[in-house]
């Protein structure tokens, strides 16, 4: 039985944890060992305990951010992206410019196809570390992927609207082929009727 299970095996068990950064750091180190061995569930338990032992003072904000970020790395490895995003966001509330965590959350957003959020995170990273070529290339890749997704969604919507329009206009002996759509420079469309 895992040492953690002794404390949590009974639902009425309440455990008071005294805040201790040395204990928190030791638990994090143990979590790191399990993470390297790919025992993610066990690593999560250690990181969670590290979080509970970490003092809530401002001087320990970075440590808290690291503990949450490390736990998020476990969730990423387990493809539990929503939980990874949640832990990354918590870590960033303690350390807003922690690039490693922003990048981890960016990857999680991309994994669940929330490309707008992924692009926002990579833009934030580039703002923090402007000269990093790797981040600039990643920014370009994600922006391109987002534009492709938006274009595909726009095409799908236009096809659906065209189908609906043809259904309605068909009752009057017309189709959308009688209408010419022209896109203006500002992104809007004008419609011209042709017989």
Predicted regions and their residues:
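Alpha-helical tetratricopeptide repeat
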Residues: 1-195
């Amino acid at each position: 039985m895992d040492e953690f299970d002794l404390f949590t095996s009974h639902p009425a068990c309440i455990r008071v944890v005294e805040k201790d950064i040395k204990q928190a750091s030791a638990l994090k180190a143990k979590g790191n060992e399990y993470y390297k061995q790919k025992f993610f569930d066990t690593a999560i338990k250690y990181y969670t305990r590290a979080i509970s032992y970490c003092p809530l003072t401002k001087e320990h904000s970075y440590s808290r951010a690291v503990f949450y970020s490390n736990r998020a790395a476990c969730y990423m490895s387990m493809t539990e992206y929503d939980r990874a995003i949640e832990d990354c966001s918590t870590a960033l509330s303690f350390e807003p410019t922690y690039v490693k965590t922003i990048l981890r959350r960016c990857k999680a957003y991309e994994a669940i196809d929330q490309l707008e959020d992924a692009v926002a995170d990579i833009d934030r990273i580039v703002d923090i570390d402007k000269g990093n070529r790797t981040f600039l290339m990643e920014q370009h890749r994600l922006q391109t992927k987002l534009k492709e997704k938006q274009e595909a969604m726009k095409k799908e919507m236009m096809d659906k609207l065209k189908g609906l329009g043809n259904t309605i206009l068909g009752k009057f002996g017309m189709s959308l082929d009688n209408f010419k759509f022209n896109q203006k420079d500002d992104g809007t469309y004008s419609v011209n009727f042709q017989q």
